[in-house]
Amino acid sequence: KDKIFDYFFVILIIFWFFSAIISLWMFFTQFGVKIPMDNRYYPLRMGFLGNRLFGVFPDPNFGATISVVVILLSVYYIKTNSNRAFTLFNSLNILLQLMFISLSGSRTALIVLLTVTAVGMFFVSYHSKKIDSQKLFLRWILSIISSLLTIAVLYLIIDALKTGLSYIPSLLQMKEASLPTIDTKNNLNKVNLDRPDVSNGGDISNLRFSLWSSAVEIFKSSWLVGASAANYIPYAHDVLPDSFIGQNTLTTHNFVFLIMASTGASGLLVFFIFFVNKIYISLKYLFGKSSLMQDMNFYVILSVLAITISALFITELVLVSTIGAVVIWFFLGKITSLENKDSLSK
């Protein structure tokens, strides 16, 4: 069974490795393209546009979130694989994914990265030999402090990468023009990475608050069974034309509100019971298992957490056909297998 996951891990890692390389090339060359499409609210965007790196992904939030998952899987192989070449590849891959995340301007991916790192570091510290011998309360405090310090350092690394990379396009242009690179004050320009859609006093939620409020309106109008996944937007146009979704062809950007609008209270209840069960299994495993850094299940659980957090801000996880949905439901199968007492006792 683990071989199937190994194959999946490696394929995902390799694919995202080359995706990151191509995306970074688009940033360094300042390539960007925008194609209007009749069936989309936003045009198809690729490359560097709007002061953020879309790269090969039409939506950088989705791409950068999977970059976090790929970082987790690369760490897993660094810890468990003795092949030096493969270790070097995964180390380089982690750097490339961090570079893409820093340039993507995805606040969702940054929240996901910091949260998953904090949770992962908490449990690693919790089971470490230095902390394991302490009293339970002190053990928790030291683990939390370790998590906070780790994400503080990680945030500084992301910020440093973002600042450093912003000068590379200018350096490449200077090299192509055969300009002297010594006079950096006059020739070296920094690429602006401040998103105009959320900076300068813009909507901090980027329309999410309006979308969530509109999803609640749909839920209230059909609270038991919802308006269906494929029909809640047309339903809003017909039944609630004054609502935000009724006036725009936009999705809910939150899996909870998507379930509410699409399946109503019945679907929300079923999913809530299912998800609480998976949370219980995961926490039981994480608190009961030591040597987590070499444990595949540890990284699977963190990957599920990563995509779940992202689904609080983008349309992901349920009732969609995305790479994130494929990853999380595949990994949830792995978590479900942990219910077996034999798996928990290993």
Predicted regions and their residues:
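Short, Lys/Arg-enriched, Gly/Pro-containing loop segments at transmembrane-helix junctions
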Residues: 35-37, 165-168, 341-346
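A membrane-periplasm/extracellular boundary helix in multi-pass inner-membrane enzymes
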Residues: 21, 27-30, 121-199, 213-221, ...
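Transmembrane alpha-helices of multi-pass inner-membrane enzymes
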Residues: 113-121, 297-346
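Alpha-helical transmembrane segments of multi-pass inner-membrane proteins
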Residues: 6-44, 48, 55-130, 134-142, ...
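Juxtamembrane loop-transmembrane helix junctions in multi-pass integral membrane proteins
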Residues: 3-7, 81-84, 133, 249-262, ...
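Membrane-interface micro-motifs in multi-pass membrane enzymes
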Residues: 54-67, 252-255, 260-264, 317-328
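Long extracytoplasmic/lumenal interhelical loops at the membrane interface
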Residues: 41, 47, 196-263
